[in-house]
Structures are given as C-alpha cells and as structure tokens.
UniProtKB/Swiss-Prot annotation:
It is found in: Secreted; Cytoplasm; Cytoplasmic granule. Residues 333-367, 379-406 are annotated as: Disordered. InterPro entries: Lipid_transp_b-sht_shell, Lipovitellin_superhlx_dom, Vitellinogen_b-sht_N, Vitellinogen_open_b-sht, Vitellogenin/Apolipophorin, Vitellogenin_N, VWF_type-D. This is Vitellogenin.
Amino acid sequence: MKLFVLAAIIAAVSSDRFSSQSQSTGGQTYPSPWQVGKQYRYEVTSRTLAHLQEGPSSGSAFKAQFTIRVKSPGRLQAKLENPQHGNFNEQLPDPRELPVDLKYQPTPNIDKVFEIEIDGGRIVSLDFPTSVPVPQENLIKGLISALQLDTSAHRVIHDSQNNYDREQQQGLFRKMETDVTGDCETLYTVSPVASEWRRELPKFANEQDPVEVTKSTNYGHCHHRVAYHFGVPVGAEWTGTAHKTQEQQLIGRATYSRILTGKEGPIYKAETTSTVHVHPHLYGKQKAEVYSHVHMELISVDQDSGAEWPRAGAMRPAQSILYSLSTKQMTKHYESSSSSSSSESHEFNFPEQHEHPHQSNQRSRRSYMRSKLVTVHKVLKKRNSESSSGSSSSSADSSSTYINDDIPDIDEPAYAALYMSPQPHADKKQNAMNAQKILQDIAQQLQNPNNMPKSDFLSKFNILVRLIASMSTEQLSQTSRSIETAKTSNNIIKSDMWMIFRDGVTQAGTLPAFKQIQSWIENKKIQEEEAAQVVVALPRTLRYPTKQIMTQFFNFARSPAVKDQMFLNSSALMAATKLINLGQVNNYTAHSYYPTHMYGRLTHKHDAFVLEEILPTLAADLKATVEYKDSTKAQVYIQAIGNLGHREILKVFAPYLEGKVEISTYLRTHIVKNLKTLAKLRDRHVRAVLFSILRNTAEPYPVRVAAIQSIFISHPTGEMMQAMAEMTHNDPSVEVRAVLKSAILSAAELQHPRNFYLSRTAQAARYLVTNEEFGYQHSFKFIDDSYDEDNDIGTFVISHIGSEDSLLPKDFKIVTNSKGGAWERNTIEASFSSAERFLDYLRDSVFAPHPKFDRAHKYSAEKIAKLLNIKNDEEEPLEASFYVDFMNNQRLFSFSESDLQQLSQYISEYMKKVESGAEKHYTKVYNQDQVSIMFPVASGMPFIFKYKEPAVIHFQSKLKGKFSFPSKDNKYYEANMIKDVQFTYAINIDGNVGFMDTLSNQYSSVGVVNKLQFNIPFKFGIEIKSGLIKFRVEPLHPDQDQTLVHYSVWPYSASQKKDSLVAISQDPATKIVERRSKVFSVDSKYGQSTHAVIYAQGYTYSSDWRNFGAKFTSRDYFTNLASLLTQEDIALTHFNLKHLCKQSQSKALTITAYYDEYYNQQNSGILTDATDRNDLSPNSETRRAEMVKLVSAGINKARVRVVDLSASFEGSQDQNYVLTGTWGDSPVDSKVQGMLFAGTKSATQGNQQINAVFATTKPEIHSLSFSKPLQSDLRAPFGMHFKYGQSGEIRVSGSFDRTKKYTTELENHPLAKQCSQQTTLNNFYQDSCHKAIVMAHAPDHVEFSVSFQDMSPQYRNFSYHTYRLYEYLGYWYTEANPLKLTQNGKMDFKIDFSYFDRTYTVDIASPSGEARMRDMPIATMAPGALSFYQPLKAYELVANYFTGHQYQPYCSIDGTRIHTFSNRSYEYPLSRSWHVVMQDESTQRGNWHELAILSRRQQRDQQEIYISYKSESGQDLEIEIQPASGDSAYQVKVTTNTKKITDDDLTMYWDDVKEQPFLQYHTHKDGVLVINIEDDRIRAIYDGQRFVVFTQDYRNSTRGICGRMSGEQRDDYLTPEGLVDKPELYAAAYSLNEENSDPKTQELKALATQQAYYPEYKYTSILRSDPTWQEESQSCGEDQWQSETVYKSRSYDKHKGACEVRQQVQFYENHGDICITTSRVPSCQSHCRAGDYKIQHVQVTCKSKLDHDFRMYKEQIKKGQNPEVSGIPSVKQFKVPVTCQP
C-alpha cells in the first residue's frame, strides 16, 4: 500500500510539472512551433569527424527518423526510429563530407519513447527511460538542441542594440541560452529568407514564406559550461576568443545554427554546426579540425489523434539539455538572466594584466570623483588592484558554481579525466593484468633502444599511465604489491619494470596515486633521492589539489618519515608549497590549470588555511633555523615560503630584509630572488618592495641586483622604468648600472603579447639608458621570446650577478619556458656567497698546501698589515646552492661550509668505491608537459584534445678506476678510468585532436607525433697524466648496428576502440598522412676511410627543409635549437643516424692530447723549409723533441710550446691521424717561429703527411709610450712554407704594416689627444694612453703572396670560390675583374683594416681574375686581437675588451697620477715615503700566496720598487729595484730560495716544485724593465719613473694605492681606517713611517685617520609608514575619491527619537573578514535621513569571520551598542551625515 501511495504522489507531481507550464514570459505569450494534436516527422542526420589540413578524415555518422507528438501544451513525446550509426577513417574529396559507401549499423538503446518539456520554443527539461544510457541521452540532447527556437525575452541580455519585431518576424538580439554544449550567450538573428527557399524545401513549396533564424554562440561568455581541462598553459585561451594582449588563441571554437521555420511553425529545417580548430602541438598554422554537424529536415506534419505512446518503464528526468556525465542531477547556480552583459561575465584577470599601472590609470581617469557606496554590512567588490596578491585569475565565467561531477574521492580514480564520457564507477578487473603486460612489454623494449621509436615505447607508457589513473586505491595497492618485488631484483628488466611503474603512478595524477606514493615513502619502499624525484613531480601531475590534499601533502612533507631523509626533506617541502601556489594562492592557475569547469573550484578562493596554517609554520621554521645559524635549512625554507607566492610572505621576510634579524648578505639576496613567484602575479606591493630595494644605494649590490632581476618579472611601471634608466647614468654601483642597462634593452625587444606592457615601457625608456659599455663579467639580464603569431617556441632568460672577487658570477641562472609551461621550466641556477672561495675550498679539499717560510722579509705582507693596521675583511660564511627545475623536478641543493666538508668526504668515498667497481642503473619516464581539454560538440559527443611530451632517460653504467693524488713521490694528479655506458634519451611531442563516438565507443582522432631519440652505447676509457690526456671509446655491442640519433614526424588519422591497449602508431587502422614528393632525402655512408662507418638515412616531405638555415635566425641558441624539433609545415619526416658496427673494421677510437712547455731553449741554426717527418706514430716523444729543436733554432732563450693530438682507429687495420704543432718565441728575441705536422698512417691507404713552418719578426715595441711607436714604422714580415705529397708545396710571404693613413688617424683621434694631454703632465700610462698604445701597435694593412706548386685543380680556383661564397651571402659590396690575372701558381692578397669605421677590405688577385670585397664588418675588438703590444698577449687584450679591462687588469704608478685595477684614476705624486702598491696576506683557505709591493720616489723622476712574494709551493723572493743612473742598467737585487738558471739578457729563477720559472726579468729594447713572477701570475713594467703591474689574481683582497681590484671604483676609497673622500688622503693612508719617510705624507696620513669613516649598510624598510603620514596621505591624497571603497554609516539604535547625528561604532563584512571601526562614527537613525554628507577617514580593525569575539562585537553593534576593539588598524572612508532630518 505504501508503494502504491508513493507512486501516485510521484505521478501527480510529474503530471503537474508538465501541465502547469505556461508558454508565456513576463506576461507576454509567445507562439510555440509545436501545435497540440500534431505529429512531426523529421529526417535526422548527424556527422562528426576530425581531420588535419590534409590526409584522411576520421569520424562517425548517425541517421534516423525523428517523430514528435504534441499531446498537450508544453509537453511533447518523441522517438527515434530506425537509428543507424557508422564509422569511417579514409581520404575524402571534401574532408567534411561522408564517404559515399559508408556502411551503417543499427544503434541500440536509443529508440525509446522520451518526453520533452518546452516553454514556447525553449527546451525546459526531458524525461528518459532509465534503459537509455547516458551517452545516448547526450546524443538525443544534441539533436533536440538543434530544434530549440526561443525568440522570447527570456534571459535576454540588456543591450541597446537588441531588437525584435514579432509582427515582422525580424530582429537581432543576444540572450543566454542552454544547449548541449553549454549555457552561453547566443546571438539570434531573425530575418526573411530568399525566394529560392522552395528549392530547399520542395515538400512545403505551397506553404507561406518561412523565416530564417540563425544562432551563433559566444563561448567566451557562459554561465555554465561542461568541460574538463588540465595543464592549460598560461595565457592560452580555449573557452572563447583571445581579446587581451596577454592571451593566445589555443582553441578556436564556434557553434552556428540555422533554422527555417514558419511564422506559426513548424520548424522545417534545422542545422547546427560545431567547429573546433587547434594545432596538435598547441600553436602553429596548420590546425586540426573537429567538425560536428546535425541536420534535421521535416518530412511530414500530420494530425495526431492516437493514444499516447506508453512509457518504456521507469523514467529518468533530465533538468536541462546540457551534456551529462551521469544520471545524477546537479543544480544550476547562475545569476539573473536579465542582468547586463557587464555583470554576467565575471572575468578573472591574467597575471600579466593584474594590477598593471596603465590599466589602473585608465580606470582612475574614468572613475574620477565617482566613489563606490555600500552599506556597512554589505560587501562591495573592489577593483582588481585591491584584491589579494594571488587574485590573478582566469578566463570568463569562473564565478559559476555549477558542478558537472563530484570531485573524486581520495580512493577513487578520476573518471571524467579519461574521455569526459560516462564511466562505470567500479574497478575493471583486467586493469592490473593489462598494466603488468604493458610493463613487461615496455621494460623489454627499453633494453633495445634501436627499436624503441618503432615499438613506440613512450606512447605505451602513456597507456600504462591511463590504466593506473583508472585504478582505485585498493586496486592500485594490489598492483603495486605484485610489482614491488622487482625493485630489489638483480634482473635489469624486472628492475626497469619497477621504475617504469613507479613513474607511471607519479604521472597518473589521481588521488589514489598520491596515496600510494605516500605509502611507499612511509613504508620505505622508496627513500631519499629516489623518493625525492617522485615527490617533486607531483605539483605538475596532481589533478585535484583540494584543501585536504594540499594540507595533507604539506604535513606529510614535514613529517618525521620525510624530514629525516636526505634530499627528500627539502624536495617534498618545495613540492608541497609549489602545489599550494598553483592550486590555491594563484587564482589564475587554480582556475585555468585544474578542472574547475568540471568540479568547480577545488578549494574556496578565500579559504585562509594558507595564512593560518601553512605560512605561520614555515615562518616559525625559518626563524628557528636562522637562530641556529643553519644556512642550509634556511635556504630551503626561504625557497618554500617564496614558492607560496602570497603577499603575506612580505611580512615574513620583512624582519630579515630590514636587518632586524641578522642574516648574511647571501641569504638576504636569496630572499629577494624568491619573491619572483609573487612578482609573476604582477603584485603591486612586491613591485614596490623590489623598487625600494633597488633604489637603496646603501644596500649591498647583490641584493639590489636580485631585486632588479625580479622586478622585471613583475612588469615595472613606466615611471619606475624611466627611473631605472636614469640610474644607469649615476648609480654608484657598476653592477646595478650594468644589469639595468641589459635588462631594459632586452625587454624593449620582446615581441610576445604577454610581454606587451613590459616591452612598451622598456621601449619608452631605452633612449634614456647610458652609453657606457659594461663588461661581460658584470651583472646582466637577457630576455628573449621568439614569437610569431602562429608559433610560440618559448622564452629564454639568462641572468647573473657579478662578483667582486672573481670574473665568475655570484649567481648564474638560465631559464627556458616552453609554450606549454605554466611555471619556469628547465631552470638551472648556481648561487654562491663567493664563487672563487667555493672553488678554492673544493680544490683545497683535495690538495691543501701549507707552505712554510723560514726567511723573514724586509717588508712582508704580514709586517705591512701590522704597520698599517690592515685587517682582513670579515668573511661571510661560505654558502652556496644549486637550483634545478628539469624533467618536472624542482630541486634545491643548498650548502654551507660544513656541507662542503661532507661533500669532499663523499667524493673521496665515491672514488674509493670506483676503485673496486661501481654500477649504476637509472630509469626515469615522465611527461614534460601535458594538456587535456574536453567539451561536447553539437552532436552531443565530447571533443578531446590531448597534448603530451613523454620522455625517458635510461642509463646503465659500470665504472672502475684508479686515482693518484699529488704526494711527495708524485707531484701530479693521475687517473685511469674505464666506463661502460648505455645511455638513452627519447622524447615524443604528441598532440592528438578528436572526439569520442559514445555510440560505438570509438575514439576518432588525428594528430602529430614528433620523435627524437639519442642512444649512446659505448665503452669509455680515460687516462690522465702530467700533460697527457688519453680518451678511448669503443662500441658496447660491437656485433650490433646502433641507431645513434632518430628524428621523425608522423601526422596521422586514427580510429581506435576506447581503452585500447594498442599504441596508435601500431594500430592497423591508423593511416599516415603522406605527400607525393619528398623535399629532401639522404642515404649516405661516412667514415669509410677510417673504417668506422656512419650511416645517415632519411627523408622529409616538409617544406621547412627547403631553407634549413631559416631555423637559425633567433638571437639565442636555445630558440634555434628548439626550432629544430618543431615543424611549421607538418609533414612526414624520418631520419636515422646509425653506427654500422658490423661493417666497421675499426672497433675502437683512441684520442690523445699532449701539451708541454720548454724554457730557455738554446739551439743554433735557422728554421728551414718544411720537410717530411720520419715518425708518424701517435703521441711520439721523438717527433716532439725533433720539432722543438727545429722551432727554437736561432731564437735566444726560446720558450717552446708543443701540442700533440692524435686519433687512432683500432681494428684489423689500424688508422692513425696525427696533428702536432710547436710554437717558439722569447721575451728577449723578436723572432717567432712555428711548425705544424699533420699526418695519417694507414695500412690500406698508406702514409700521408703535410708539414708547415711559420716565421715572423715582431716589430719594435714601446710598452710605455704612445708617441714613440708612431715615430717609427711598424712592420712585421712573415713567411710560411707548406709541403704535402711528393712534391707539392705552398709558399706564403708577406708582412703586417701600419700605414701612414692609420698613423695620421691615430694622431688625430680623441683618444690620442687625451693621451697627449696626460703625457704633458708626465703621465704616460693612464687609461687613454693604454688604449692608444695598444692601437698604435696594431697593423692595419696585411699583404702577402701565395705561390703553389703541384696543387690539385680543385684548389687552384680557391679565390674564385671564396669570392662567390661572399657574393652569395650578400653581406658586402663586391667587385670582380676577370680580365686582370696573375701568373699561374700565384695569388696575391691585400687586406686593409679601418678600425675606426669597423670595416675591412680584401683584394684577391689570382689566375682566375681579381676580386675585391669592400667594407666588410669587423669586430670592435680587432685592434687588440691583431696588436703586437707586450707584455699583454692578444687573447688577453681581446678578453679585456669584453670585460672592461678586468680580465687582466693593471695598475700604473705614473708621474703624478695613479690608475687603479678597478679603473679609478686619481692625482697623487709619490713622495719619498714607502707606499703600499699592493698587499695581500695569505688566508686559512683558498689563498696561500703572500704579496707586498712598495713604491717611493727619492727624487721626482726616480721611482724605487720593493716586491715581497711567497708562493703556495713554499718558494719566496724579495726584489729591490732602483732606477738606472746614467748608462748603467737598472739595479735589481733578488733574494730568493729558488735557483738562478740564467743571468745575462734574460735572468731566470726556477721553481723545482712546479717545474716552471719562478722569476724572469729583462730589459726590453725600449729600455723598459719587464718582470714576470711565477709564469705570468704577476707581470710588471718599469722605466725608472713609472711602474705598471698586471695581475688577475688577488681580486677584492689586495690593499694599497692600486685599490681593491673589485671592479668597483667606489671600493678604491677604502683605507685601513675606513673610507676617505680625497685622493691624497687615500694614497697617504697606505704610506709607511719607515726609512726616512716624508713628513708631509705622514701629516696627510694622520688627517686621513681623522677623516675616515666606516662604510655602513642601511637596509630597506618593507612597506612601512608612520601612522601620522599614513593618515595624512589618506585624507590629503589626490585620489581619495577613487582609491578605495566608501562605506555608508548607519545607526542601529531601535528607539525612535529626535533626528540628530548619533555616534555609532560601525561594522562591515569583507569576504572572509569582519571589520569594525575603532571609534564611533556619525550616523542617522533609520527613520531619519541625512541633510548633507561628507567623507570621513576612520580606522578599522579586521579579523576572520570565524573569530568568536568579532562575531560577538557585530551582534552588539546591531543592538545599538558600541564595543571597543583593538588590533592592527587600517584607514577606510565612510560617507557620514553632517545633519539628520526627518
């Protein structure tokens, strides 16, 4: 009886729901196209297909007859009759049409009677029999959507352009309308139809003219959409049209409907077409298309007097025609349909646009004097600039709370993530079995890399991931237990099975997978490094970061099971905080990266768990580690807090940045760098903080440079950019000036729309930037985004922070951000407190010298330090870190000094392990990027786009070696290692576009797969000895051919069964897209002569290969490399590079490199023509000795360098290639000679060799004078002789000259004029003179003749071929005269350099004619490269050009001026007091040398020098130098513990420990004494009056009048007592009160002590204002009317009384807070009104709505009470009454 009553109630309710429907809206009745008592029969066809721009189409078709019976108003019965369905995958003449011979099959479970509820022409709901599956329901919804015709005003969007005339049946209006694809804005047009409509509707030609109605859907404005997405790149628009500059159109989607209907009905014809366009690889011109078309045409309209069709059993209601994923009914929550268009679309802003100053200013101008009013207890939505730091956001419609499916439970897989089609919510028993089968298959394939591309290893891995993703917790746990046994197996295949499964679980991204990983770590199945690599991938793979998961992950990262494991502890913490940023803090990624359209936002936007739980915990951890001075952990916590990217991290970091908590400069720099995540959100607060830091010149420069590098991420305002441009002129720090210039100039070149504002502001400031040139060692930031409209390769950023103690940077960072990357991807960063000290520490850990010096020096460095009270700088703790974000692994390896000690121990232990043999097996499979987007199309089937970049790294090795460290018995490091390596790296770029045919469960798709694989299967051996390195390589499998490189591109069309376990490429139904003709092909073998055969084979149909050089046009190498892996013209491509081991007779290759130097060589004779060598064997000591003797012939005290390279191919017939070169010169001889030998020794091809000799004579050098070299000719004759074959030879004779023209140009150059002015003041070696002297020794004319004998014909026209090459390149003006010939066998060359024009001209005269190439560009550093100037070498001059003279800096003690190492020049004439030129005392680690150089002038034109030097090898010397008197030589007195080996024109002392000269000195021809200590460690030139010292050591450690050598001129004001401002005080401060010192100098020294002040850092306040100024700014600020919300006060007093102003405490609620005023505010009672208003600034205090006290205060206020509150106040504006009136 109960069941009967319940059934009756349900029937009554159901019938009432239908019968009560009125076909009217707002009192107006609208006709329905369906008339009661009529039966309508339609012919229905539907097709959905996918296709590329060429090739086959893959799809399905459906047809049936559709009958509609109208039994009562608003209620229809409908039925599909004879439904049929077919699939196809074939080439079609028109890719959108169907095959003519398509075979249809009956479609079950869809021909049931169902009911439709309508309101006019609008579909309200449907009732389906429960026997109709949900996929068939969605198909029916797609058909019904095509018939929906609603011209009523229901949900019309208010817009002045809307119009509709019901009488005329014409109009155009926008409204919100629901169909199967979503509830979105729809544009209706109603218009008459052309007279030819009868041809289209022949059956109804006699009816009255129909009306044409068209509908177009705007998917950018929806109240609800049914969609699933994951991993969508930043700025990629797929829901609508990309309008903003920060957006790129990822997917183009459109739905268009056309309906022909009678004025009173019926609908004669209805067509709906959906198109989706997307490039399979995200961006590009050649889009794939998914096309869906529904066609319904009326066959007949008949009277229907028959009985209703009986229901087919129980019915299931569908409340809308939206696409469904289950039978469960969800509830819509969207705003009123009558709201305006501006209020219907709640748009999130992109991070790139968030709070941008340009937009803020525009809004401000529009809203000037227009305050927003709200009553005190209501929330007013603020401008974006007032939102939280994370409110960067997403595309439209995110406010919708409509949920399509429930978020998966912690134990459930993600059903919707697979195909966005209804799934049975139960485990498939075969999942585990199938997973194990695939695991076994691909683990076996991994052992044979040659077949991996063909067997499609990576595609099968993603099938495995799909299977794992479909498992519940229980099933996954069972599967894991069955595979975990393979983890410890010695079997390689089983071990690979475990590692592949482990990575498959990591990539699955489901909640059961996350739970399984936790279980592995807790049960120690994976530990330390292995566990770390798993955990760090989770932020990019976890698809459902709910609050529960994020807090669970964070707590897990801090649990003992994790914190006690090396590598895992830091990695887990960073992974957890990164996930929290992506899933909660960053509103943009929280919406766009995760499937919010399917499940709604996964965490509440205003949930305070980050502020209440996560951040306080991390802040406390950081505070504790700082108190314990644990730098290693502090770096990790700083990075983790920075990862959160919440604005509140500024408060956490403030005490450390402000100096209230003392930390090292390194950690402060680390904090500033880790503000980048917040800066990416364009947060204006962090932008203000960064700008304040970079503007604070009292901050340490590393902190300021880090702020500059981060502020460009936040997109600084135009005013900030202009201020920074001005700073490039006047900032005291060269590092700051350098990085600002490079950042502004590179930002101005950016082209990507996402960088539009940054580029524009930089372009406006670029012309304000200084022209000062900075060295490459200085801080810089370079940004490049190679972009065009259809191809977005990515962004490349390189930056570093310069060092004061090294040319190596303190911080070096490279970032590549791919088109699919949401975060910085492939980031490598190395950071040091001091790179120099770090390297010294590692070096000394292996070899720590402890020299002992028994002899006391007259003025040692130690003694000088005591005399002048020089104290070594207090060194900050040695700290370092390496940050890597690669393979989706974000890793931070931080070090302190104690960690480095452990590191050296670890290295030593590993070396011991290697000596007994070490094996390594590593496999890592991961998805570098993945994007999934799914949504329904017109047919009711889900469109599916999936992009993945699966990659694998497989590494197997065996290493055994022996190491010998320097000792008493052996002074050299030696090593001998043998390593077997099998290394494989493969990556697929796999894009797939299609749809799921839910009727046949067939997945129809098209796509493109790019495959790249590298395979290195070799055995390596390396031997290191003194001066010798020997490298041996041989195939690991000599009996197998090996594919070393594979590259292919496969466009295809496919049709696969759902959940197929077969890779698409291996499915027989898959069809490859091919073209008729190949663009390029290769089939060649190389290396036959060496018997090591390399085979290149392949082809391509892509037109990209017609101009391969076009791929190398970018400014950076990364972009050029990335372009090789992408195709603009997608076409079948296949290339292999193979090593044919079976055909190669050579089974091993040995490469030997030998280098040595010989000093003081004395050999009589002269260098003769080249002759053949008798010894052709590799690494021949005999040949080297012979060549050393020959090349040093005739050179006085020659120094000879020898390089010997050889390559030996070993096999049945050995093949040897040898290259030996020697070079001889001498500091006391002008001759320079060289020899070259190149030979081959082959058993099959015989012996061949080429010999060459070279000789030149250096011109006269004037080291300290600019005028003298100009007074004499600069000429350097040279000659070369080549001998090859039996009688072939080439002779070259010519000279380098300086022309009179160039001499005149030099004399008139501004540089020369500056030098002349300095010379008149007796200053010969200041900056301008140094540069001028170098240029004066540079030749500008080279002329030589080449004569040849028995030259092969192909070389005789060398000049002509060279000329044609230049002409082809087209860079320069070229001329040719084929009539002007030289004699056979001779060529003449003339090269003229114009250094000031930066061009050169080449004239070539040959037997083929004369050619001239004019005005070819030449590098600016050419004079240095060609200059003969000494004592600097050519490469040092070039390096100095690129480093601002800091590679080999110099200091000159000139006549009246001193030029410091850091390029500061100041006036100071030396007195008779000894002055410290340089002083550097040895430290405990890293610097074991001691140096002291003193200088004084006993007379005005005579300078005396004293040098004290002690080396790390235990050698020491003292040198006392006095100027020459009359014709006598310089008086040089040397006291040393080394042995003198020569003592005439070149004096040399020998270091027996290092086996090299310890001291050399000689007097040059120009009368300059040249000193060389420890083989160029210190060089000096001296002419009796002036002294110049060159050295690149002692950076930032030396003290004296030559400065600190830090590269910063501002450092050259620091004396032992502090900073002084006057140059005479600075120099006098380094004078000694010894040996008859000058009284005046001592007076200046005493004055310097009095005036000195110590440098002091003053740290930056972080967003701190005093209360008075803050209040004044609020009340007096110009933007007070527009800057914030204005609240309206009210009185809560319930007792009516006289209308007068009452004082009442006010409250309002804002998001998750309750805010209460700290004082009473004027207000009027509710029965009164205000006579006038004013704006009053009031302090308020806010706390969470969960706060018990504030909830109580709110209730008291509502009762009229006035509670007192306390807390941190902020100032808000209230609109208060001046008077109250009745």
